[in-house]
Regions:
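Residue-level hotspots at or immediately adjacent to binding/recognition sites across diverse folds
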Residues: 1-247
Length: 247
């Protein structure tokens, strides 16, 4: 790399569209995007983002990325399609099918699991996922074209993403574009943005929610120590101290 900019990876397929990127540590990065050649596009770097390598589509039950279903893609709503804990990485799809992919080897090989959230439409499915630890995670999304609909728009897992159960179905906020666990809360405290009403938080793992702000944002991240929630969207960058959120 010379100067301050350089091309470190380029996809030759003109339909390529990357939706999210995540850093597992100082050296390993994983990015994902819409399907190319029959599976979600996944690329990895093991040296801090210099050269990248594309993970191939799996052949039958072999290593790689499992085949995508008709209309399955991903939403670039909040860089929320990827999450990790240790060496385990999860990846979320939406649209024609909304599934959770899991890699136990830092993104090199993947298995995929179904979710019960609404899917099948162009703007339905999961928009964001997060994991509190290697077993407990949450998916949030819904129908972008019917944002008030709070049915089958969120699900949780307690077995590392293999099975999912609908969460607070028909109660609480509707569509959301970014959901995050607060660090240090043992998976009990969450924040949600992208809803029609603004910012909501939960104290019980997502079963019930409190509305804390009418301001609209698209993405959210907690500071590493959980002392503040950072949000962005609509030309704004905001910070909510934990005390303002009731914690």
């Amino acid at each position: 790399m010379t100067g301050r900019r350089a091309t470190v990876w380029q996809e030759s397929d003109s339909s390529a569209f990357l939706d999210a990127v995540i850093a597992l540590d100082d050296t390993t990065l994983v990015a994902m995007g819409d399907p190319i050649d029959g599976c979600l596009c996944v690329v990895r770097s093991e040296d801090g983002g210099q050269p990248w390598a594309k993970v191939p589509c799996a052949v039958k039950d072999g290593p790689g990325v499992p085949a995508s279903r008709e209309g399955e893609a991903a939403f670039a709503a909040s860089n929320g399609n990827l999450s990790f804990a240790g060496d385990t990485v999860w990846m979320l799809s939406g649209g024609g099918a909304s599934r959770v992919y899991r890699s136990l080897d830092r993104g090199q090989s993947w298995t995929v699991f179904d979710t019960p959230i609404q899917q099948g439409g162009q703007m339905t499915g999961g928009f964001s996922l997060d994991f509190a630890d290697a077993r407990h995670g949450i998916v949030w999304g819904g129908n972008w074209e019917a944002k008030e609909d709070n049915t089958a728009r969120a699900a949780v897992t307690s077995d590392g993403g293999e099975t999912w159960t609908l969460l607070a179905d028909g109660a609480g906020p509707g569509y959301g574009s970014s959901v995050r666990y607060r660090p240090g809360s043992a998976g009990q405290q969450l924040a949600l943005v992208g809803t029609p009403g603004g910012v909501d938080v939960s104290d019980d793992g997502g079963t019930t929610w409190r509305h804390v702000s009418d301001s609209s944002f698209y993405a959210a991240r907690f500071s590493p120590d959980g002392s503040a929630l950072w949000v962005s969207g609509n030309g704004q960058l905001g910070r909510f101290p934990a005390s303002v959120l009731g914690w």
